Amino acid sequence: MKTIHQTNVGGAGGFYTGMEYARLADADWIWCMDDDVFPRLDCLEQLLAYAGYEGVGILAPRRLLEGRIYTNDFLSFNLTRPFSSMYSGRLSKMEVNSPVEISGTAFEGLFVRGEVVRLVGLPNKDLFIFCDDTDYCLRTVAAGYKILYVPTALMDKEKFFSDDSWGERNKKKKWKRFYQIRNSSYLNHHYGKNWAVKYLRGFNGVIGYILIAFFSAPFSGAYRWTDIPMFWKAYTDGIRERLGRL
């Protein structure tokens, strides 16, 4: 086992460093996961059963939260319709009992072929946190590889902030919201196929957070009115593709 110590470079920077080390070690496959997921004993075995499928570059396990299926995996990217989500065909709305080809998954058990990393490159470390996995899946699919969701490969996901109130939970997560807004705006601007997706989808998203902050600030400790210009800056940084640690 190799432990790498570095400064706080966010989740994206952590995956960048880990995957770079594995690539230099000429790894055939690289298993990426956050610290809040725990693979079942046969999870890797179940993933490897599909490693030989033609064109597969990434294998994605099924995650369970408190014993129930937890997934934000999806079938395809929507890069043309600005008033619909970027993520089309969410598996959370389907019953999936056999492997299915998808377009996006999370860095929570993502099992990527070393060949993909050598061709597509490393995660975008300048995203810091949020959307680095979506960006990587976009690049992988664009390079012609398939992503396969394997429902028999199971991982358990830990639940954080389970006993917190709405205000407490959002106060703890607020710093992440700025990255979420900026990076999702960046993705839409960078990969969107038309002006509306590039600018309006991110705008719609940030307006929602601005309204929540405006109306909840007097009544909860989650947001303050001073957060509003910061939310707007996160959006403008995204569409100008200014990344890095905030």
Residue ranges and their predicted role:
Residues 92-112:
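A recurrent flexible, glycine/aromatic-enriched loop bordering the glycosyltransferase active site
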Residues 42-74:
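Conserved donor NDP-sugar-binding/catalytic core segment of glycosyltransferases
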Residues 15, 42-44, 132:
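Acidic donor-diphosphate engagement hotspot in glycosyltransferases and nucleotidyltransferases
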Residues 150-169:
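Active-site donor/metal-binding and catalytic loop motifs
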Residues 27-36:
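Short beta-strand-to-loop acidic/aromatic patch adjacent to the donor-nucleotide binding site
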Residues 193-246:
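Non-catalytic, C-terminal membrane-associated alpha-helical segments of glycosyltransferases
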Residues 110, 116-121, 126-153:
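A short, conserved alpha-helix in the catalytic core of glycosyltransferases
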Residues 1-13, 21-24:
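Conserved donor nucleotide-binding strand/loop of the catalytic core
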